[in-house]
From Swiss-Prot:
Chain's gene name: poxK
Region listing for Disordered, in residue ranges: 1-25
Listed EC numbers: 1.-.-.-
Statement: the UniProt record of this protein carries the keyword Transcription: no
Organism field: Penicillium oxalicum (strain 114-2 / CGMCC 5302) (Penicillium decumbens)
Alphabetically ordered keywords of this record: Oxidoreductase
Sequence similarity: Belongs to the asaB hydroxylase/desaturase family.
Bias kind Low complexity: ranges: 1-12
Reported induction: Expression is positively regulated by the oxaleimides biosynthesis cluster-specific transcription factor poxB.
Pathway: Secondary metabolite biosynthesis
Protein name per the record: Hydroxylase/desaturase poxK
MF terms in GO: oxidoreductase activity
């Protein structure tokens, strides 16, 4: 399926029109939004790409800012890893295609040209990964013109919980292959990279999973497809997902707490990427060396961003990753 042809943003040209200093670097203390608490039986919800019932708001989630020190990984990129932090930095990605080879406004072009390189990069980065299945991608931009991309997500979140990860495996891998793959190690990993780096505006902050406690993550609901309804069933595993069917899944909304460590990579470029692990089944095993297995994350506004800095334009590719270990 090819999206309607629309102009590709020429955001990089902004930096060519004026003289800019290098992107901000170093640790920074800045506000990050966290969802407010809900008292049971109430819970947070949001409708994504499908309308809510008449009279129901798209979301009831409200953010509250907390001052967070975000540590810069530049120069110490190897200090984080997936097993401890659910975060890994990839560099030297010269084989991952970019514009003009990829038309970012064409779903078909992204799937045909970009997806295989992402799959190869993840297999290379994650030991033992034998199968990588991409189930979605999202492009974000700090301006919604000339293309109506979504803006950066400016509230801390975790895209799927453990039960949602199981449903994703069954939903996308089918009723035969899905249960078999669930017998091994299964993960959800985001591949995040800029499309116009280096990033000046709204970088991504990721909390080390080893420092975020389970009881500091609230469970909310995403309504993802079909006819909206607050009583629609949780995600039903199906062999061939139908975009018109009703579907929802749990996602996580963290609270900020002392002891959490947050990271970003200053000035991340187009030959770099972040692997942000959303779920790792090995974290559920007794005596596992995987600490938490899920990285909450959020974009944030850096007060050091210079005037006239280029907009952020980025892609996040959501992957199911399977290994036998």
């Amino acid at each position: 399926m090819t999206a309607t042809a629309t102009p590709v943003p020429t955001v990089a040209s902004h930096a060519q029109d004026i003289t800019l200093p290098p992107p901000p670097k170093g640790d920074i203390t800045t506000p990050i939004l966290f969802a407010q608490d809900f008292q049971k039986p109430s819970t947070g919800y949001m409708f994504i790409k499908n309308p809510p019932p008449a009279g129901v708001p798209y979301t009831n989630i409200r953010g509250e800012p907390a001052m967070v020190t975000v540590e810069d990984l530049r120069g110490k990129e190897n200090s984080v890893n997936l097993d401890r932090d659910s975060l890994q930095v990839l560099q030297g990605l010269t084989d991952v295609p970019r514009s003009p080879e990829v038309n970012w406004n064409s779903v078909e072009s992204v799937e045909k040209t970009f997806y295989p390189a992402v799959e190869a990069a993840i297999k290379s980065a994650i030991p033992g990964a034998h199968t990588v299945h991409i189930f979605r991608h999202g492009i974000r931009h700090t301006q919604n013109w000339p293309v109506p991309y979504n803006p950066p997500a400016m509230i801390a979140h975790l895209d799927q919980t453990g039960p949602a990860a199981i449903n994703r495996v069954l939903r996308h891998m089918g009723p035969v292959e899905g249960p078999r793959l669930l017998q091994g190690r299964y993960r959800i990993v985001h591949f995040w990279t800029p499309l116009n780096g280096p990033v000046y505006t709204c970088p991504v902050a990721v909390a080390s999973s080893a420092t975020v406690k389970d009881n500091d993550i609230q469970i909310f609901v995403s309504h993802l497809g079909g006819i909206g309804g607050l009583d629609m069933p949780l995600g039903r595993p199906v062999a061939k997902p139908d975009a018109s069917e009703q579907y929802r899944e749990d996602f996580g909304a963290p609270r900020y707490a002392d002891g959490q460590r947050w990271f970003y990579l200053s000035g991340i470029t187009q030959d770099e990427a972040l692997l942000i692990q959303i779920f790792d089944s090995n974290a559920l095993q007794k005596d596992s060396t995987v600490q938490g297995g899920r990285a909450v994350h959020s974009a944030f506004r850096d007060p050091r961003t210079p005037q006239g800095a280029p907009d952020r334009w980025s892609i996040e590719v959501s992957c199911l990753v399977f290994s036998d270990e």
